């Protein structure tokens, strides 16, 4: 416990919280190029083939990003936009690719939650 005199001389040290998405460098999104598109299996107790891409960002950092939605058109050298947000059952995947931006197409035939998947409004 510091004395009043010590506090007036030095003051308290601020506690800084570490960011959960350091590769974004405090930006909301970052542009990148896909270097590899692959499927990975989740942690126990889940079972699936989750679609992920290895992305080299404009800052030069290489990260693994999740491709949300059913079906995608991504391949090597595709330009993508990534945002923060981890995938709980995929260790090391801390970023999401934004559907409907750059080379990434929106999800086809998506009726609900369209804004999250870059799908246009279906005209009846």
Swiss-Prot record:
InterPro entries: NA-bd_OB-fold, Ribosomal_uS12, Ribosomal_uS12_bac. It holds the Pfam family Ribosom_S12_S23. One of its GO terms (biological process) is translation. GO terms for cellular component: small ribosomal subunit. GO terms for molecular function: rRNA binding; structural constituent of ribosome; tRNA binding. It comes from the Bacteria. Keywords: Ribonucleoprotein, Ribosomal protein, RNA-binding, rRNA-binding, tRNA-binding. PANTHER family: 30S RIBOSOMAL PROTEIN S12 FAMILY MEMBER. Belongs to the universal ribosomal protein uS12 family. Part of the 30S ribosomal subunit. Contacts proteins S8 and S17. May interact with IF1 in the 30S initiation complex. HAMAP family: Ribosomal_uS12_B. With S4 and S5 plays an important role in translational accuracy. This is Small ribosomal subunit protein uS12. It comes from Treponema pallidum (strain Nichols). The gene is rpsL.
């Amino acid at each position: 416990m510091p004395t009043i005199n010590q506090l007036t001389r030095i003051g308290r040290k601020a506690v800084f919280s570490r960011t959960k998405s350091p590769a974004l460098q405090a930006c909301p999104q970052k542009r990148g190029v896909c270097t590899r598109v692959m499927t990975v299996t989740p942690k126990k107790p889940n079972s699936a083939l989750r679609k992920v891409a290895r992305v080299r960002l404009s800052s030069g950092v290489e990260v693994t990003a999740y491709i949300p939605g059913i079906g995608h058109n991504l391949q090597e050298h595709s330009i993508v936009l990534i945002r923060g947000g981890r995938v709980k059952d995929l260790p090391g995947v801390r970023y999401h690719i934004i559907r409907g931006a750059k080379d990434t197409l929106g999800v086809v035939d998506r009726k609900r939650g369209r804004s999250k998947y870059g799908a246009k409004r279906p005209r009846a």
